[in-house]
From Swiss-Prot:
<dbReference type="GO" id="GO:0006357">
    <property type="term" value="P:regulation of transcription by RNA polymerase II"/>
</dbReference>
<feature type="compositionally biased region" description="Basic and acidic residues">
    <location>
        <begin position="441"/>
        <end position="463"/>
    </location>
</feature>
<comment type="similarity">
    <text>Belongs to the Mediator complex subunit 26 family.</text>
</comment>
<keyword id="KW-0804">Transcription</keyword>
<dbReference type="Pfam" id="PF15694">
    <property type="entry name" value="Med26_M"/>
</dbReference>
<keyword id="KW-0010">Activator</keyword>
<keyword id="KW-0597">Phosphoprotein</keyword>
<feature type="region of interest" description="Disordered">
    <location>
        <begin position="98"/>
        <end position="331"/>
    </location>
</feature>
<comment type="function">
    <text>Component of the Mediator complex, a coactivator involved in the regulated transcription of nearly all RNA polymerase II-dependent genes. Mediator functions as a bridge to convey information from gene-specific regulatory proteins to the basal RNA polymerase II transcription machinery. Mediator is recruited to promoters by direct interactions with regulatory proteins and serves as a scaffold for the assembly of a functional pre-initiation complex with RNA polymerase II and the general transcription factors.</text>
</comment>
<keyword id="KW-0805">Transcription regulation</keyword>
<feature type="domain" description="TFIIS N-terminal">
    <location>
        <begin position="10"/>
        <end position="87"/>
    </location>
</feature>
<dbReference type="InterPro" id="IPR017923">
    <property type="entry name" value="TFIIS_N"/>
</dbReference>
<dbReference type="GO" id="GO:0003712">
    <property type="term" value="F:transcription coregulator activity"/>
</dbReference>
<dbReference type="InterPro" id="IPR035441">
    <property type="entry name" value="TFIIS/LEDGF_dom_sf"/>
</dbReference>
<feature type="compositionally biased region" description="Pro residues">
    <location>
        <begin position="314"/>
        <end position="324"/>
    </location>
</feature>
<dbReference type="Pfam" id="PF08711">
    <property type="entry name" value="Med26"/>
</dbReference>
<feature type="region of interest" description="Disordered">
    <location>
        <begin position="427"/>
        <end position="470"/>
    </location>
</feature>
């Protein structure tokens, strides 16, 4: 009688006895016996998972120097890998192979994993996986897409059941199709029948039910495979006509696959046809969509309209600017009322116009309301929409050109600012101030006084030159600290000294003024130092005995030079405090740390 073959657990124990904890072989004969017994033993996937024999054999293969033993171990591991792979191939296809070639070309949608290719464990796992998939994808919109696809194929009529294939041809098909998927999902294409298909066909209805189950099982991949790119024009439309054309092409492909011949080489042409079909589908969607979804942009041409609509709150884009009422509606909500706009001075109109960043001249809605002819405003609006970089510059400085003369006539459109001699005020874009254009013209009587307020201090002395001299009015203290003034004065003094001029210039007066100012400032500020005290005459402990009064004085009273010191501002510091002084009176701080004595 022959002894019963050892169990996988016994084989594992024998292998562990023949190697050390670092997987180095201690007993070569025992390891070779273990590998030969494993080569003959019909091991199952569950036994491999329980005993972890795959990891042990792989570690031995890496550590051994016997090439024959390493080759046998590698061959054994590959046979075990084929045993494990078909079970996990569906999960790997759904997780990691979604971006593989063929999965995004529309051909992945009619693939079904091959049931029964790996024996009973795989079929049980497959049924459990199919039952779990609808729950996983229940909250996604992909089921809606599979229903639509099922409905389209039901309307078109699904191709009938394919003819049965002999067992030998099916056996030759399974090893070719299962390890090498042709379109991104493991398993064979649907047109090649599996044992379940060839065993009993229920007609077109049963085939349709199987196809719906296939859609549920494939989960996300069919919808992702036929979903167009986000930049495609027909993104928001239901994919009805595209799927109809896809179903027609797939029906033709199924007919092609039914012809006899070697089954495996048809995989790559099928994938290329699927990719061609997806490209045809995108162009078909473009031809079939004269109107587009609300959120998508069919072509670059309407894009400027949408951008302009965000800037100009009017129902018409900027390409049709010859309607002044639309422009008038734009400025009225921001303005208080048209009458008060007319009462304000021109300078404020220009300031408000420059504040509008939309590039529309603010004086356009005012001129027709004031009784002037609206034709000039129309012409100006047409000129404003001329486009290009020149139009941007014109828009930026456009409010200068819209000024009303004292006579009540409108200035012509397109006139350069240099030719407008009648203006009282002008806006300086560099200083962002409103300044008078010429000093000779008299001030208008109807203009309010507060238009003079935005001027700087340097402009006010020019207006009051008749009352005070600029020398008395100017704040020389502020000017002396200006770096530009100081650099200018130093350059002037160097020029004067090099030319040998004897006349004192502005730099002489400025330097004299600065010297005088500095002397008065130093005289006003006193230095902050410690109070000096004379040499001590009484030395307790040296010249006489230490008394109780000395102890009380050093503990409870301030004794300069003994338990602390005093500064000129009346602050007392003991020897544990930091002292901060200003010995020169020039804001320079001298910080004395504790336990430091200065002579």
């Amino acid at each position: 009688m022959t002894a019963a073959p050892p169990s996988p657990q016994q084989i594992r124990d024998r292998l562990l006895q023949a190697i050390d904890p670092q997987s180095n072989i201690r007993n070569m004969v025992a390891v070779q016996e273990v590998i030969s017994s494993l080569e003959k033993y019909p091991i199952t996937k569950e036994a491999l998972e329980e005993t972890r024999l795959g990891k042990l054999i792989n570690d031995v293969r890496k550590k051994t120097k016997n090439e024959e033993l390493a080759k046998r171990a590698k061959k054994l591991l590959r046979s075990w890998q084929k045993l494990i792979e078909p079970v996990h191939q569906n999960e790997a296809a759904l997780r990691g192979l979604a971006g593989a070639p063929g999965s995004a070309n529309g051909g992945a949608h009619n693939c079904r994993p091959e049931a029964g290719a790996a024996g009973p464990p795989k079929s049980v796992h497959d049924l459990k996986y199919r039952n779990d998939m609808p729950r996983l994808c229940g909250q996604r919109l992909d089921r809606l897409g599979s229903r639509k696809r099922r409905g389209d194929q039901r309307d078109l009529g699904h191709p009938g059941p394919p003819p049965k294939v002999s067992k030998a041809s099916h056996d030759s098909l399974v090893p070719n199709s299962s390890p090498l998927p042709t379109n991104g999902i493991s398993g064979s294409p649907e047109s090649f029948p599996s044992p379940l298909d060839s065993s009993g066909h229920v007609g077109p209805e049963g085939n349709r039910l199987e196809h719906g189950e296939n859609d549920k099982h494939s989960g996300k991949i069919p919808v992702n495979a036929v979903r167009p790119h986000t930049s495609s024009p027909g993104l928001g439309k239901p994919p009805g006509p595209c799927l109809q054309t896809k179903a027609v092409v797939l029906q033709q492909l199924d007919k092609v696959d039914e012809t006899p011949g070697p089954p495996h080489p048809k995989g790559p042409p099928r994938c290329s046809l699927g990719s061609r079909n997806s490209r045809h589908e995108g162009s078909f969607a473009r031809q079939r969509s004269p109107y587009t979804y609300k959120g998508s942009l069919p072509s670059p041409s309407p894009r400027p309209q949408s951008l302009d609509a965000t800037q100009v709150p009017s129902p018409l884009p900027l390409a049709q600017p010859s309607t002044p009422p639309v422009r008038r509606l734009e400025l009225l909500p921001s303005a208080e009322s048209p009458v008060r706009w007319l009462e304000q001075p021109e300078g404020h109109q220009r300031l408000a116009g420059l504040g509008c960043k939309a590039g529309l001249p603010p004086a356009e809605p005012l001129l027709p309301r004031a009784g002037f002819s609206p034709d000039s405003s129309k012409a100006d609006s047409d000129a404003a929409s001329s486009g290009g970089s020149d139009s941007k510059k014109k828009k930026r400085y456009r409010p200068r050109d819209y000024t009303v003369n004292l006579d009540g006539q409108v200035a012509e459109a397109g006139v350069k600012p240099v030719r407008l001699k009648e203006r009282k005020l002008t806006f300086d874009p560099m200083t962002r101030q409103i300044k008078p254009l010429t000093q000779k013209e008299p001030v208008r009587a109807d203009s309010p006084v507060h238009t003079e307020q935005p001027r700087t201090e340097l402009d006010k002395p020019e207006a009051k030159a008749s009352l005070q001299s600029p020398f008395e009015q100017t704040n020389w203290k502020e000017l002396s600290r200006n770096e530009i003034i100081q650099s200018y004065l130093s350059r002037q003094s160097s020029l004067l000294s090099s030319s040998g001029a004897q006349t004192p210039g502005a730099h002489h007066f400025m330097s004299e003024y600065l010297k005088q100012e500095e002397s008065t400032r130093r005289g006003a500020r006193k230095p902050h130092v410690l109070v000096p005290h004379g040499p001590p005459t009484d030395f307790p402990g040296l010249s006489r005995e230490v008394t109780r009064d000395d102890l009380d004085k050093i503990q409870a009273h301030q004794w300069p030079g003994v338990n602390g010191c005093q500064d000129t501002q009346g602050n007392w510091y003991d020897w544990t405090q930091c002292i901060s002084l200003d010995p020169h009176g020039d804001d320079g701080r001298l910080n004395i740390l504790p336990y430091v004595c200065l002579d």
